Amino acid sequence: GLGDVYKRQHRTVHTALPTAILSGAILTVAGLTYSETFLIMMGTPDTVLPLSTVYMRIIFCGVTFNMVYNFCASILRAAGDTKSPLVFLLFAGILNVILNLVFVIQFQMNVAGVALATIISQAVSAVLVVIALMRRTDACKLYLNKLRFYKPQLAKILRIGLPAGIQSALFAISN
């Protein structure tokens, strides 16, 4: 009945966030470990390899924020709130530009500053989207103390999300 639907939605929301965090952590470790190898495989010129490696390693430190934003924004959109994720992304984009200027011009941080600005902006968008879920009044309301892996929901998230994620990654690599 309706109670079962609510329960499944509630469990999906509370499985999605830990899944995003765990996925992000795994990708961060892989990225930090293999950034230079990936860049060499892509044919990055030796002249820019050191700076590219710095940039990529810093960016990989923020992958978890990106995963949290994407998972939670998808939940909001599925629940009918398409505006909030867009507003949060717009705010994060403006913040990114401002932080780029501050870190690069004011603090002379160059490539590291650009990467740091990006992950700070991603962190802000992730926090905003989590707060939006915590303020909901429906089955998508997020309670931090109820986060866990519910096996049926995790299986469905992985069954649907893993192929889509691999497809997106392959598309990004090919371009």
Features from the language model and the residues they span:
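Interfacial transmembrane-helix starts/ends
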Residues: 8-22, 30, 34, 53-56, ...
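Membrane-interface helix-loop junctions in multi-pass transport and translocation proteins
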Residues: 93-127, 131
